[in-house]
Design a protein with these regions (language model features):
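Canonical Rossmann dinucleotide-binding motif of NAD(H)/NADP(H)-dependent dehydrogenases/reductases
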Residues: 2-33, 172
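Catalytic Tyr-X3-Lys loop
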Residues: 78, 86, 97-119, 140-141, ...
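Conserved mid-core segment of classical short-chain dehydrogenase/reductases
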Residues: 87-105, 124, 128-136, 154-157, ...
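Active-site helix of classical SDR
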Residues: 119, 161, 169
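Alpha-helical segment proximal to the catalytic Tyr-Lys
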Residues: 124, 173-175
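Residue(s) in the substrate-gating loop at a strand-loop-helix junction
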Residues: 145
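Short, small/polar-rich loop/turn modules that mediate ligand/substrate recognition or access, typified
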Residues: 177-182, 236-239
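C-terminal substrate-recognition "lid" of short-chain dehydrogenase/reductases
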Residues: 219-243, 248
Length: 252
């Protein structure tokens, strides 16, 4: 699809990978609706890029529908990028006992259920679009993690949530093929995001050195470039792309 003149939803667009993607889509001429819990930051980014902001808990049906409704009101909704997520760390059995079931459930709810909630509602709206000359009515990108494949110690909940995103990528693409809607997933490796920047500098340096090539942290721009390419390349569908510099995570 051509990005210019289309409307895109970016969840988690107030910071990190989502913010980078929202900015790049806007630079390409897209209108972006940022959906995030960070109101002040989200509104500021939306204003800078000429988009819109909607406060949204992606796992809440009413919140998600409000985002989709806002996007449709601005024009032709053709894209969704799911970047909202959490990454708590807790061992199955740790010093304080068994893993919190509430924390496990919350991680699944935000990361997996939240992604699917946005997908199903955005796809419903896209299915009503007049198709492009290629027959396409929209495309969606979710964010998983390499932890879906080689999760580390303390990542049971996080890995499970991302494994679910990976697992539903193909069946959703098959479900929506008749509607002319594509579905893809990006599984980033170690990226420089607000979450990682909260770690000590020596830890950040060690993580970057562990990436075979290029030996650096990924950037929001790296992610955004791939997201834009996915939107523009109609043959990319039903696949998970690892964006990780060939890293395979060690146990810890």
């Amino acid at each position: 699809m051509e990005i210019k003149g289309k409307v895109f939803i970016v969840t988690g667009g107030a910071s990190g990978l989502g913010e980078g993607t929202a900015r790049m889509l806007a630079l390409r001429g897209g209108t972006v609706v940022i959906a995030d819990m960070q109101v002040e930051k989200g509104e500021a980014v939306a204003k800078e890029i000429g988009g819109a902001f909607v406060r949204c808990d992606v796992s809440n049906e009413a919140d998600a529908q409000a985002v989709v409704d806002k996007a449709v009101s601005l024009g032709k909704l053709m894209g969704l990028v799911n970047c909202a997520g959490i990454a708590p760390a807790e061992k199955t059995v740790g010093k304080n006992g068994a893993h919190s079931l509430a924390l496990f459930s919350k991680t699944i709810t935000v990361n997996l259920v939240g992604s699917f909630n946005m997908i199903r509602l955005a796809a419903e709206a896209m299915a009503k679009n007049t198709p492009e000359v290629t027959g396409e009515r929209g495309a969606m990108i979710s964010t998983a993690s390499v932890a879906a494949y080689d999760g580390q110690i303390g990542q049971a909940a996080y890995s499970a949530s991302n494994g679910g995103i990976v697992g539903m990528t193909l069946p959703i693409a098959r479900d929506l093929a008749r509607n002319g809607i594509r579905n893809m997933t990006i599984a980033p490796g170690i990226f420089g995001t607000p979450m990682l920047f909260g770690m000590p500098q020596e830890v950040q340096d060690a993580l970057a050195a562990g990436v075979p090539f290029p030996s650096r942290l990924g950037t929001p721009e790296d992610y955004a470039k791939l997201a834009v390419h996915i939107f523009e390349n109609d043959m990319l569908n039903g696949e998970v792309i690892r964006l990780d510099g060939a890293i395979r995570l060690a146990p810890r």
